Amino acid sequence: MKANELREKSVEELNAELLNLLREQFNLRMQAASGQLQQTHLLKQVRRNVARVKTLLTQKAGA
């Protein structure tokens, strides 16, 4: 997910995206804990996407 794509979204859309990412992160962590996760790079990608969305939400709140 690109930062430019996220900047075009509204606050409501960013909150929805954040919720989806957190759910995905939870599912990936459960798969990793049970040894079922084959693509471990997804954990890092989702974590960074969560950070991107949170950063944009903070920036939009301050503007």
UniProtKB/Swiss-Prot annotation:
One of its GO terms (biological process) is translation. InterPro entries: Ribosomal_protein_uL29, Ribosomal_uL29, Ribosomal_uL29_CS, Ribosomal_uL29_sf. The keyword Transmembrane helix does not apply. One of its GO terms (molecular function) is structural constituent of ribosome. It comes from the Bacteria. Keywords: Ribonucleoprotein, Ribosomal protein. SUPFAM superfamilies: Ribosomal protein L29 (L29p). The keyword Ribosomal protein applies. GO terms for cellular component: cytosolic large ribosomal subunit. Belongs to the universal ribosomal protein uL29 family. This is Large ribosomal subunit protein uL29. It comes from Enterobacter sp. (strain 638).
